[in-house]
Design a protein with these regions (language model features):
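Core segments of cupin and vicinal oxygen chelate
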Residues: 49-75, 125, 137
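Sec-dependent signal peptide cleavage junction
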Residues: 18-55, 167-173
């Protein structure tokens, strides 16, 4: 009977110790795929984009109206390796709803490594964006006939040391 009680006690201790163990950190990448970004660039509708981007944890930050287009900026705060980052995604749409561009900027995740394998079927071309003119920035530009995609890695000085900002832009042709 003593061994039975001991066995039951050990069983309960094991169950309760396991139940109180810290939850494992999710390894799912919270960034949209190239396919998703391309779909968003095809929407030509901020309302549809707004619903989709919020599902990834982004919150609306600001609206910027310009002569030919309107930009909607969304941000999300993330912590990676105990360092706080702000991810930013901008949805720019022509005022006549004829075209839209998605831009994503982050320092929290290496977007070049994340997106490059997804772009194997795209043709690489000459980059003609503002970031590609900066000596501290490396850009690779892709084209599949329907979309133009720029992926950039910018070397930056941070208070805690050197780092990188990553940028991707998807525009429908």
């Amino acid at each position: 009977m003593k061994s039975f009680r001991l066995t039951i006690s050990l069983l309960f201790i094991t169950i309760f110790a396991h139940a109180q163990a810290p939850a494992t950190i999710a390894t799912k990448n919270p960034f949209p795929t190239i396919s998703t970004l391309s779909n968003w660039a095809s929407y030509n509708s901020q309302e549809k984009f707004n619903i989709d981007v919020r599902s990834l944890g982004f919150k609306f930050e600001e609206k910027s109206v310009e002569a030919a287009s309107t930009a909607y900026t969304y941000i999300r705060k993330v912590t990676v390796d105990n360092i706080n980052y702000t991810d930013r995604i901008v949805y720019r749409i022509a005022n006549d709803n004829s075209a839209s561009i998605i831009s994503l900027v982050t320092a929290s995740t290496d977007l070049v490594s994340f997106f490059t394998p997804q772009l194997t079927g795209y043709k690489t071309g000459k980059c003609d964006n503002e970031m590609s003119k900066d000596k501290k920035t490396t850009c690779t530009c892709y084209d599949n006939g329907k979309f133009v995609i720029d992926v950039c890695d910018e070397r930056v000085k941070l208070t805690m040391g050197d780092g990188n900002n990553y940028f991707i832009s998807v525009a429908k042709k």
